[in-house]
């Protein structure tokens, strides 16, 4: 759907398939806003395993993308040639920690965000014309994030006065709300150091094969740091959940 007034200008929606980015696309369609494509960058754990929580990845590829394409919105999927595992096992090449594996990314200084997500997006953005307009999913009740918008970025949620809760309800009504909102209020990779306890517990309970992969990485020697997040090793979290399970079984 291309604007007649600016038919040479591209309009692209950045899409994580969370509530805010999907609500942005739904609003564009509802109000006849120009929209040429949605762009999604998938971070990979390894060459075959997605970094998306499995329920969210299934929603993306089995529900959301087919639905958007039926509505006339093509979806472009970007990926880095680097995976989480590539970066985790990669060696530091300079400084006092030279030779050590990078290990778990630091909260607030995530090399995965930088190398596996931002770089593919920036590489793609360089192929676009300078006047390309980017729709971003920032709600009307997020003033700090709205203040950071650059000149080529537009929030349709702000334009149509949609809060985060409004965006969630819009997606729910349209049958396009990711199932991850049943146990979290945020998006993120299943190996994210910023993951909340409830998200980690979901991974532990429902995806033991992925949990085991993280314990394998914890056991890998020669890492810069043993901490998974700011305070704990992944094995500490595992031990805490096992203790919780044991107490529940004893109480039963």
Per-region residue spans from a language model:
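Nucleotide-activated chemistry modules centered on ATP-dependent adenylation/adenylyltransferase
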Residues: 1-252
């Amino acid at each position: 759907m291309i604007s007649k007034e600016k038919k040479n200008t591209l309009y692209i929606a950045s899409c994580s398939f969370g509530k805010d980015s999907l609500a942005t696309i739904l609003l564009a369609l509802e109000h006849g806003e120009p929209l040429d494509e949605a762009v999604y960058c998938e971070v990979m754990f390894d060459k075959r395993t997605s970094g998306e929580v499995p329920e969210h990845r299934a929603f993306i590829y089995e529900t959301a993308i087919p639905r958007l394409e039926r509505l006339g919105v093509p979806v472009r999927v970007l990926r880095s040639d680097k995976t989480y595992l590539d970066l985790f096992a990669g060696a530091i090449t300079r400084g006092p920690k030279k030779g050590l594996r990078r290990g778990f990314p630091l909260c607030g200084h995530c090399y995965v965000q930088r190398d596996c997500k931002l770089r593919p997006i920036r590489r793609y953005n360089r192929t676009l014309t300078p006047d390309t307009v980017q729709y971003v999913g920032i709600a009307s009740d997020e003033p700090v994030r709205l203040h950071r918008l650059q000149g080529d970025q537009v929030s349709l949620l702000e334009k149509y006065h949609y809060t985060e809760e409004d965006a969630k309800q819009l997606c729910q009504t349209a049958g396009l709300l990711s199932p991850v909102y049943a146990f979290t209020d945020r998006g993120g990779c299943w190996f994210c150091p910023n993951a909340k306890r409830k998200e980690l517990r979901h991974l532990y309970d429902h995806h033991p094969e992925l949990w085991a992969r993280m314990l394998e990485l914890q056991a890998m020697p020669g890492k810069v740091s043993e901490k998974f997040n700011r305070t704990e090793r992944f094995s500490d979290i595992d031990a805490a959940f096992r203790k919780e399970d044991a107490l529940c079984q004893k109480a039963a």
